[in-house]
Amino acid sequence: MGIRAIVVDTAGTTTDLNFIQDVLFPYSVKALPDFLEQNQHNVLVENCICDTRDIALEPDADLARVTEILQQWVSEDRKATPLKTLQGLIWKQGYAHGEFKGHIFPDFIEAVKRFSAQNLRIYSFSSGSVDAQKLLFSHSDGGDLTEMFNGHFDTRTGNKLDKQAYCNILNTISLSPKQVLFVSDVIEELKAAEAAGMMTCQMVRDSTLRTGEFRKISSFDELLIE
C-alpha cells in the first residue's frame, strides 16, 4: 500500500516556533485595534467579532472590549477560530507590505520538492487558519511553495489534539489511514493521529523537546519515503 500523502504540522515542524511567537503574534497584537476599527463592517470581520463575544460569553462587549479579549487570547495561545481568522487577515497585510517573510526550515523546502517529485500528496494541518498557512508558504524565505501542496487544514477540521480531526482529514483526502504519514513535534497530536490509524513521525528539532514512543527525525532530510 505504502505512503501516498504526508500531513505536516507547521510550528516547530516546518516553521521555527520563534518566528510565530516573536514575529507573527506580536504583530497581530499591535495591529488588532486599528484593524478592527477600520474593518468592523466587513462581513467576515463582523462575524469574527460576534463569534468572539459568543465564545467569551460577553454579548454586549464593545469593540474595545472585543479587542482586549482577542489580545488576551493571543497571550494565552488560544486556538479560537475567530482569532485565527483575524490573525490571518492581519498577517496578509504584513506580508503584502513586506513587514516580514514566512520562515520555513531549509530542509523542508528541499523535502517538499522531493516529495512532490515522488507524486506524494502534501498537506499542512495547523491551528493557524488556512489563509495564514497559505500566506506563510507563499511568502516564504524559500519562495512560493504553495504549488507543492495539495491542501491545508485548520481548526475548522477539528482540534489537533482530537482523533476526530484526523479522521476528518482522512475522509477529505479519501485515503486509508496507513497511506498517510503525519509529522509533528507535539506528542499529543501524534497520539491523536495514531488513534485515527495514521502513520506518525515526531520532528525533534530541539533536544529539550519532550519525546514519546514514535519514530523520530531531527530534519526532513532524514524522512525518506520509498
Swiss-Prot record:
Membrane spanning residue stretches: none
Record GO terms (molecular function): 2,3-diketo-5-methylthiopentyl-1-phosphate enolase activity; 2-hydroxy-3-keto-5-methylthiopentenyl-1-phosphate phosphatase activity; acireductone synthase activity; magnesium ion binding
EC number of this enzyme: 3.1.3.77
Gene3D superfamilies for the chain: 1.10.720.60, HAD superfamily/HAD-like (3.40.50.1000)
Metabolic or biological pathway: Amino-acid biosynthesis; L-methionine biosynthesis via salvage pathway; L-methionine from S-methyl-5-thio-alpha-D-ribose 1-phosphate: step 3/6; Amino-acid biosynthesis; L-methionine biosynthesis via salvage pathway; L-methionine from S-methyl-5-thio-alpha-D-ribose 1-phosphate: step 4/6
Record-level GO BP terms: L-methionine salvage from methylthioadenosine
Alphabetical UniProt keywords: Amino-acid biosynthesis, Hydrolase, Magnesium, Metal-binding, Methionine biosynthesis
Subunit description: Monomer.
NCBIfam families hit by this protein: enolase-ppase (TIGR01691), HAD-SF-IA-v1 (TIGR01549)
Protein name: Enolase-phosphatase E1
Originating organism: Shewanella baltica (strain OS155 / ATCC BAA-1091)
Gene name of the record: mtnC
